[in-house]
């Protein structure tokens, strides 16, 4: 599985990197295993390297400097429940990644055992994986050339495009012959496998170019017989339209999967914004796949007139007003659905208005009066996306009742200039690393340092006076999101108050003994009795009344970046199985201090695996040799995005 070689690094680095000749570093001639996870990066382009039509002044660029991302899978690959015939079925990778060429990625590659012993916790520089894409860019220097226009195709065509893009500007020298042979063999293997996108596509699925003959005929037969295409359930009724076309917006994007986690990153250097979505699915892949395909387009539409203006006329405004009624076939459905949705929307809007009012009445008044409108737009986008998902699931309930079990946590971050907008449902987190106030440092941080693993502390003690002082963490952790789980007393009390006649509303620290999170996208069996009744008896809960046990009402937060803000960690909850907020921030700070050219997200994944292995009494490689699915006993799927701010401020165009 995987590409014959790693994706050639295109992350641009500092001046030292530019002075080096481009080199190709091939670490292993064998195909890389993409099933474990991926590390990826995006570095803001140098304006001098961008065409004059796209050059923006420093005041017009995005606030962040770099994006480092990494994901590791613990669960096995699971096909969409709606797939009757799936030409992707032979692809059993639990992890995958694809992007435009402005991103660089490489599969996570454990250091070979033969390279020497790996002692968990031997110090901050201890390594379990080979270099990530950012570090490789520093070692080999940036490749010439800028990314071309976004191609509508994904999968194998894209990976081949990445190879050719890098090779066009590569100068190999005396090693040319042997390297060309390796590359030719790698590309040949990639083409032979006929790999295609195994992540839910941004646009509705097109017929794979590599499906021929009887398979193609069979696909057409199934498509004609299905009410909802089994190959593109996640794209059915897509919110995409001409306004949201990625090709027409000059956007750079990346999307990946790791087990049941999904990650989506969209960058607009032209308009100065960044979108990151992390979707932590459970009970199946359909819900996070649907979010991956639909939530960003919905957010983009809701933000029209707030963060962006349509240069075209509003001739299509009447069509946009009818987006919720886009599926004409649903008109024959019972009016009970429409009535329940109207009641739900009213409750959602009422709760949202109360939430925003409570925020405005708080001690820290929001300096941006527009922020409440932006946050409300994010919430409305999520509501419409879930309504569409549940409506599609309701249409397929007889054939695929398991859709009622599937759900996902949601973490969305939108950055526009100095403004950061957060929306979350579930227990994924956004944690900000800030320069701490002196009083705060003397008190809380010193206490938190005691919880840092003793191996790292021993490494501090082994440093000289000068070095040791520089390694002491100086940043505080500020969580921008709110956890929605049974670990939060307020959430438990809310559910019990809403279900006074049900003593088992929360039992065994789970909602109805089933779900740890108290809010989630999907999971219809905890929201309406009919979805619970559609399940096999062994999966049903004792549903009392008609009120939902969980909801999808998000927590919302606006933060104005300042000079003290250094980096932002966005992650699914798997990270915090082994890290506190303070430990995660301290780990990233320590890493970028010692290895400023490194990949902090990959480092966090690596340290998490070290801790999981140590807790289980095994070494790093032994843990990774445990098959996916069984390895879920030791750690969860984990997706991490670290956005470097470095305390610098750039203003985006408005």
Swiss-Prot record:
UniProt entry keywords in alphabetical sequence: Developmental protein, Hydrolase, Magnesium, Manganese, Metal-binding, Nucleus, Phosphoprotein, Protein phosphatase
Phenotype reported upon loss of the gene: Plants show abnormal leaves altered in shape and curling.
PANTHER family: PROTEIN PHOSPHATASE 2C, PROTEIN PHOSPHATASE 2C 23-RELATED
Domain PPM-type phosphatase: 243-645
Chain spans, region Disordered: 11-30, 309-336
Protein name: Probable protein phosphatase 2C 23
Subcellular location: Nucleus
């Amino acid at each position: 599985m995987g590409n014959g070689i790693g994706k050639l690094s295109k992350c641009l680095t500092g001046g030292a990197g530019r002075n080096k000749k481009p080199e190709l570093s091939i670490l292993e001639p064998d195909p890389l295993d993409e099933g474990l996870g991926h590390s990826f990066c995006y570095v803001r382009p140098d304006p001098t390297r961008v065409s004059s039509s796209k050059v923006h002044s420093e005041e017009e660029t995005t606030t962040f400097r770099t994006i480092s991302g990494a994901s590791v899978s613990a669960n096995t690959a699971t096909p969409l429940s709606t797939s009757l015939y799936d030409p992707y079925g032979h692809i059993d990778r639990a992890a995958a990644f694809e992007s435009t060429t402005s991103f660089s990625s490489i599969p996570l590659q454990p250091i070979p055992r033969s390279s020497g012993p790996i002692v968990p916790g031997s110090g901050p520089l201890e390594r379990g994986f080979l270099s990530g894409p950012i570090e490789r860019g520093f070692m080999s220097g940036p490749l010439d050339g800028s990314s071309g226009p976004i191609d509508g195709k994904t999968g194998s065509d894209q990976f081949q495009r990445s190879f050719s893009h890098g090779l066009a500007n590569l100068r190999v020298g005396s090693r040319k012959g042997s390297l060309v042979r390796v590359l030719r063999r790698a590309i040949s293997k990639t083409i032979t496998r006929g790999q295609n996108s195994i992540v839910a596509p941004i646009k509705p699925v097109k017929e794979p170019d590599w499906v021929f003959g009887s398979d193609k005929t069979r696909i057409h037969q199934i498509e004609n017989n299905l009410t909802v295409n089994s190959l593109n359930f996640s794209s059915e009724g897509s919110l995409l339209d001409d306004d949201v076309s990625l090709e027409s917006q000059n956007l750079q994007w990346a999307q990946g999967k790791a087990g049941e986690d999904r990650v989506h990153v969209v960058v607009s250097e032209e308009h100065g914004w960044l979108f990151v979505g992390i979707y932590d699915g459970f009970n199946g892949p359909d819900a996070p796949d649907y979010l991956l395909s639909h939530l960003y387009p919905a957010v983009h539409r809701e933000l029209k007139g707030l963060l962006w203006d349509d240069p075209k006329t509003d001739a299509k405004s009447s069509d946009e007003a009818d987006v919720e009624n886009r599926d004409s076939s649903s008109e024959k459905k019972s009016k009970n659905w429409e009535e329940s949705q109207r009641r739900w929307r009213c409750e959602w809007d009422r709760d949202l208005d109360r939430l925003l009012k409570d925020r405005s009445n708080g001690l820290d008044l929001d300096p941006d009066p527009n922020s409440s409108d932006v946050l409300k737009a994010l919430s409305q986008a999520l509501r419409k996306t879930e309504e569409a998902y549940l409506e599609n699931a309701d249409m397929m309930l007889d054939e695929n009742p398991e859709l009622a079990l599937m759900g996902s946590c949601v973490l969305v971050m939108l950055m526009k200039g100095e403004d950061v907008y957060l929306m979350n449902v579930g227990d994924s987190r956004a944690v900000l690393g800030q320069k701490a106030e002196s009083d705060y440092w003397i008190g809380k941080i010193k206490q938190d340092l005691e919880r840092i693993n003793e191996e790292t502390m021993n490494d501090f003690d082994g440093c000289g006076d000068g070095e040791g002082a520089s390694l002491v963490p100086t940043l505080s952790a500020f969580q921008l999101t709110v956890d929605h789980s049974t670990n939060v007393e307020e959430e438990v009390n809310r559910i019990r108050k809403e279900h006074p006649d049900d003593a088992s509303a929360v039992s065994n620290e789970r909602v109805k003994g089933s779900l740890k999170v108290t809010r989630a996208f999907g999971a219809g069996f905890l929201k309406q009795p009919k979805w619970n009744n559609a399940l096999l008896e062994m999966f049903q809960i004792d549903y009392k009344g008609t009120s939902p046990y969980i909801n999808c009402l998000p927590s919302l937060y606006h933060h104005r970046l300042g000079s003290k803000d250094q980096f932002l960690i966005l992650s699914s909850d798997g990270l915090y199985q082994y890290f506190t907020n303070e430990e995660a921030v301290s780990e990233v700070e320590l890493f970028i201090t010692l290895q400023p050219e490194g990949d902090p997200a990959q480092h966090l994944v690596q340290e998490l695996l070290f801790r999981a292995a140590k807790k289980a009494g095994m070494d790093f490689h032994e843990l990774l040799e445990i098959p996916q699915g069984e390895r879920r006993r030791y750690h969860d799927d984990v997706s991490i995005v670290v956005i470097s701010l470095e305390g610098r401020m750039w203003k985006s165009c408005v």
